[in-house]
Amino acid sequence: MAPGSRLDLGDRVRVVDGGFGSTLEARGADLAAPLWSAQALLDAPDLVAAVHAAFFRAGADVAVTASYQVSVEGFRRAGRTATDAATALRRSVALARTAADEVRAEQGSDGLVAASVGPYGAVLADGSEYHGRYGRSAAELTAFHRERIVVLEDAGPDLLAVETMPTVAEALAVLDALDADGPPAWVSFMAVADGRTAGGDELAAVGPRVAAHPRVAAIGVNCTAEADVAAALEALAPTGLPLVACPNAGGEWDAVGRCWRYAGLGAVDEGVATRWVAQGARLVGGCCGVGPDDIAALAAALD
């Protein structure tokens, strides 16, 4: 895939993996620490690689790296160093690539690695990524994101997954951090009812502004209730870009207990997912609470 190129999906649907942090937790990782799933990059890299491999074996075409919550600022807040943060960022891509190569050798599959770029609120670990009101300027957000994007891109991912964006302001700040050349990116928002972002922006107005960036290859939603996905895709379809649909399994973040309280570890409904494809979704997967078994069922339904 040429640097700076748009991801040519055509009519092909690629299955994205599920909830990485929730799957790590289900396999014994302690996510109560301030660094959440990023802690496993330092303390349990073999487990990180194993989770990626499990999703690939289940039928995922794309692995999203465990870098969602990795940043210099976040690591310093947790008593770590900038060097630790850079190590974790590079390792997140390397471990996903190792898993892709391992499963390719077994099955002949051609898995892609998407480097996760999560919202600034994930660093604060207080749930503020669910509304995007950080008290930070656009320039400050761009500088924050640029610092880690440079390291991630140097590690050689196939894509960037700019995910769980609560507002258009932060999404545009991330895009301002991108150089002209680099891997294609998808941008996915956390959406709520009636085609709005979690921060209250109308996706119909947001879409064209994001899609205009030359490195944006797809646009959509993640970490969104299944019932709210269709309206979001309808709002974003006029961009003409391939759409992203990666809903969660339902639940709420417990900021005190520092864990998810799931309504149930349900699967992405395969029948609903085929309707999303009809709406233009070409990257379909899951988010929090969606595990490898769920992705296997989804992959079979979309095959």
For each of these PLM feature ranges, what is it?
Residues M1-D303:
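Domain-level signal for soluble alpha/beta catalytic cores
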